[in-house]
Amino acid sequence: ALAVGRDLVQRRLAEALADRAAPVVAMSGEVVLGQGRAMLTAIVCVDFQAVGQWAQEHGVAYTSYAELSQQPQIYDLIGGQLAEVNAHLPHGLSVARFVNLHKEFDPDDGEVTRTRKLKRNVIDDRYGPIIEAMNAGQEQIDFRAQITYENGQTGTLDRVLRLSDVKGAA
């Protein structure tokens, strides 16, 4: 049931993002995960341009995408958008928890194709510890990720990521 629910939620999120009536379309990429797990969770990549503008208008200081994505006000913004989507979903098929990822999904990292189609198996494998931490109810996770730079070199990035509940999730 969660696999079907995951796909329904993914479609509803895409529809909500396409709805330009929203004051801020804050997500540029998201993946809803739930197959084989107790709840639906979301890994969100914030839209740097839209959220950056929102942050500037609301006095939220940041120096990088990673810093912006982890600001409490941005978690509130994303949580509110997820709660709005949840309000239109059947009981039990709402996103219960989410994380704002410290980076955007990137073709160079193998997470999406060049046409921006998500590679779920790669995301599930790479971000498995985050997904498990969300399902375990943790409030944050120390996450180490390998990254690929535009010049092809690789490096390691350590981040503390906040894990958050979506208000009103059933």
Model-derived features with residue positions:
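AMP-binding adenylation
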Residues: 1-170
